[in-house]
Structure formats: C-alpha cells, structure tokens
Amino acid sequence: MRIAVGLGKEGGEERLERQGISRRDFMKFCTAVAVAMGMGPAFATDVAAALTGRRPSVVYLHAAECTGCSEALLRTYQPFIDTLILDTISLDYHETIMAAAGEAAEEALQAAVNGPDGFICLVEGAIPTGMDNKYGYIAGHTMYDICKNILPKAKAVVSIGTCACYGGIQAAKPNPTAAKGINDCYADLGVKAINVPGCPPNPLNMVGTLVAFLKGQKIELDEVGRPVMFFGQSVHDLCERRKHFDAGEFAPSFNSEEARKGWCLYDVGCKGPETYNNCPKVLFNETNWPVAAGHPCIGCSEPNFWDDMTPFYQN
C-alpha cells in the first residue's frame, strides 16, 4: 500500500487518472457519501470537489483500542481506501499501516504536526488516565501526553469510534485504567472533538465528516457531540423491521420462523429504539447491517453502551 505524504501539487483529476480510478466509480462513491450526509445525490459534485482539492495533512493517533475502527475505515469502498482516500488526503501518520517505524515514525509525526499548513487529527481509542496516566505508552510517552501535546494544535479533531468518543469498553465497569473519551480529557485545553462513534463506525460516516470539514460546512452536533447528519435518527426509525414493531410482531427467539420472516427483534434484546445511527440507511460495505442479518442492535454508538445496554439479549 502506497501512502501519500505531504500536500500534493497535482490536481484531483490527475491523481484519479494515475490511480486508474474511473470518474464513474469516483462519482458513485461521492454520491454514497452525499446521501450518508443527508445532502442527497445532487450534491455528489460538491463532495467530489472537496475530495479532489489540495490534499490536507491528516494525523491518525491510536490510544487504548482494538484497531477495529481502522479496519473499518480501510474497508471503505468505491474506490477502496488505498487507491483514493489515502491519496486524496495526505495521511502522514498512522501507526497501523505506515511503513516507517521507530524514530522514523516519530520524525514523520513531528513533521506533520509542525508543518506550515496545519493538519486534521483523527483519534482512535480511549485515554487511560489512571495511575498518573501510566497505563498506556507509545514511544516512551503516555497516550495522555501524546494527545495533550498534539490535539490543541490541530485544525480539527475527530474522535473515531466509541472508545475515543466516550471511553468505550475500556471505560466499562470497573474501568481499572480510568479510561476516558477525548472531550472528557482535553476540554480544558480547548479541544472540542467531533464524535463519530460506533464499534466500529461506518466508514462513510468517517469520510463524510472529513468531507464536511474540507467543504467548510458547519457540522451540527447533537448533545453528545455527534454529527446530526449521521446520528440524527434512531436505528429504530430507520429499520426495515419497524413495521413489525408497529404491528406488535416480535420474534421470540433467534432462528425462529418469525425471525426469518423479518419480525422485530426487540424481544431478543434489540436496542434500536435507544440508539442513534444510520446503519440501516448506509449499510456496511454496501452489503448488510446487523439487524437485517438477524442480530439485534447493541447500541454501540451510544455513550456507556457496554454498561447501559447490557445484557445485550434482553429488554
């Protein structure tokens, strides 16, 4: 995988042509992003303009997490992440996929953070604050200090995944590392991260948030810091099984005849009525989403869901 570094001088059309990406495929992707943003397919050209402009420097930091959010982002489609997104943005630091290691990686991070044109910072993972922040180290520095030194310098900060947004499973009771989300840790430093939660979040929500920033669009947030364009409706209201809920038709168990008929999964634990996300609308990999596949929503985009939504298979 080739990762572009630095602000590119070539135009967007040239980059697409060099990567062998047809305009048709590119516009199909832009249409999907526009729809996910609630703008409608007519705004695909605006998304395309944002993605083919001058490449912004992006720094992607990891804290206490499982890397599932990165795995989800790497599986964005039409075109795939390695042929479009990493060449549209200049991903200057990402520990999981960058070729550099050790001192070379640290030098790349400092070069991006101190560059003349600024950078956007994405953060995946919760911040361990227990035992004087010593539960998590990278390159001899605590995760807390790394983010403390970098986030206030960023043009924008986006928390990727529920761990970075609200603490996630790291913050589940009894929370032995005193893990916290980004805004809980650094609000006193003036950091106000945009939260894109999920375990993992849909890649279109991640990309759409970046597109909105690149377009200079004002991003309306809900009371827990999520973009309303992606998290403004409940899973319940968007769900294709909603009509069965309204009709009082509930599957009594998994793999029951009623479940196979598409009846509502509320009685087997679905948390869709309490969860705000666009999973039924955008799907994952254009293929499916958990409830359509027969599994109840577990509320993974909500704060404290590991504690508040369990047991997952009861309501």
Curated annotation (Swiss-Prot):
<dbReference type="GO" id="GO:0046872">
    <property type="term" value="F:metal ion binding"/>
</dbReference>
<feature type="binding site">
    <location>
        <position position="163"/>
    </location>
    <ligand>
        <name>[4Fe-4S] cluster 1</name>
    </ligand>
</feature>
<dbReference type="GO" id="GO:0008901">
    <property type="term" value="F:ferredoxin hydrogenase activity"/>
</dbReference>
<dbReference type="GO" id="GO:0009055">
    <property type="term" value="F:electron transfer activity"/>
</dbReference>
<keyword id="KW-0004">4Fe-4S</keyword>
<comment type="subunit">
    <text>Heterodimer of a large and a small subunit.</text>
</comment>
<feature type="binding site">
    <location>
        <position position="264"/>
    </location>
    <ligand>
        <name>[4Fe-4S] cluster 2</name>
    </ligand>
</feature>
<keyword id="KW-0003">3Fe-4S</keyword>
<dbReference type="GO" id="GO:0009375">
    <property type="term" value="C:ferredoxin hydrogenase complex"/>
</dbReference>
<feature type="binding site">
    <location>
        <position position="297"/>
    </location>
    <ligand>
        <name>[3Fe-4S] cluster</name>
    </ligand>
</feature>
<feature type="binding site">
    <location>
        <position position="270"/>
    </location>
    <ligand>
        <name>[4Fe-4S] cluster 2</name>
    </ligand>
</feature>
<feature type="binding site">
    <location>
        <position position="239"/>
    </location>
    <ligand>
        <name>[4Fe-4S] cluster 2</name>
    </ligand>
</feature>
<dbReference type="GO" id="GO:0009061">
    <property type="term" value="P:anaerobic respiration"/>
</dbReference>
<feature type="binding site">
    <location>
        <position position="199"/>
    </location>
    <ligand>
        <name>[4Fe-4S] cluster 1</name>
    </ligand>
</feature>
<dbReference type="GO" id="GO:0051539">
    <property type="term" value="F:4 iron, 4 sulfur cluster binding"/>
</dbReference>
<keyword id="KW-0732">Signal</keyword>
<dbReference type="InterPro" id="IPR019546">
    <property type="entry name" value="TAT_signal_bac_arc"/>
</dbReference>
<feature type="binding site">
    <location>
        <position position="69"/>
    </location>
    <ligand>
        <name>[4Fe-4S] cluster 1</name>
    </ligand>
</feature>
<dbReference type="GO" id="GO:0047806">
    <property type="term" value="F:cytochrome-c3 hydrogenase activity"/>
</dbReference>
<keyword id="KW-0560">Oxidoreductase</keyword>
<keyword id="KW-0574">Periplasm</keyword>
<dbReference type="InterPro" id="IPR037148">
    <property type="entry name" value="NiFe-Hase_small_C_sf"/>
</dbReference>
<dbReference type="InterPro" id="IPR006137">
    <property type="entry name" value="NADH_UbQ_OxRdtase-like_20kDa"/>
</dbReference>
<feature type="signal peptide" description="Tat-type signal">
    <location>
        <begin position="1"/>
        <end position="49"/>
    </location>
</feature>
<keyword id="KW-0408">Iron</keyword>
<dbReference type="Pfam" id="PF14720">
    <property type="entry name" value="NiFe_hyd_SSU_C"/>
</dbReference>
<dbReference type="InterPro" id="IPR037024">
    <property type="entry name" value="NiFe_Hase_small_N_sf"/>
</dbReference>
<comment type="similarity">
    <text>Belongs to the [NiFe]/[NiFeSe] hydrogenase small subunit family.</text>
</comment>
<dbReference type="Pfam" id="PF01058">
    <property type="entry name" value="Oxidored_q6"/>
</dbReference>
<feature type="binding site">
    <location>
        <position position="66"/>
    </location>
    <ligand>
        <name>[4Fe-4S] cluster 1</name>
    </ligand>
</feature>
<feature type="binding site">
    <location>
        <position position="300"/>
    </location>
    <ligand>
        <name>[3Fe-4S] cluster</name>
    </ligand>
</feature>
<feature type="binding site">
    <location>
        <position position="236"/>
    </location>
    <ligand>
        <name>[4Fe-4S] cluster 2</name>
    </ligand>
</feature>
<keyword id="KW-0411">Iron-sulfur</keyword>
<dbReference type="GO" id="GO:0042597">
    <property type="term" value="C:periplasmic space"/>
</dbReference>
<protein>
    <recommendedName>
        <fullName>Periplasmic [NiFe] hydrogenase small subunit</fullName>
        <ecNumber>1.12.2.1</ecNumber>
    </recommendedName>
</protein>
<dbReference type="GO" id="GO:0016020">
    <property type="term" value="C:membrane"/>
</dbReference>
<dbReference type="InterPro" id="IPR001821">
    <property type="entry name" value="NiFe_hydrogenase_ssu"/>
</dbReference>
<dbReference type="InterPro" id="IPR027394">
    <property type="entry name" value="Cytochrome-c3_hydrogenase_C"/>
</dbReference>
<keyword id="KW-0479">Metal-binding</keyword>
<dbReference type="GO" id="GO:0044569">
    <property type="term" value="C:[Ni-Fe] hydrogenase complex"/>
</dbReference>
<feature type="binding site">
    <location>
        <position position="279"/>
    </location>
    <ligand>
        <name>[3Fe-4S] cluster</name>
    </ligand>
</feature>
<dbReference type="GO" id="GO:0051538">
    <property type="term" value="F:3 iron, 4 sulfur cluster binding"/>
</dbReference>
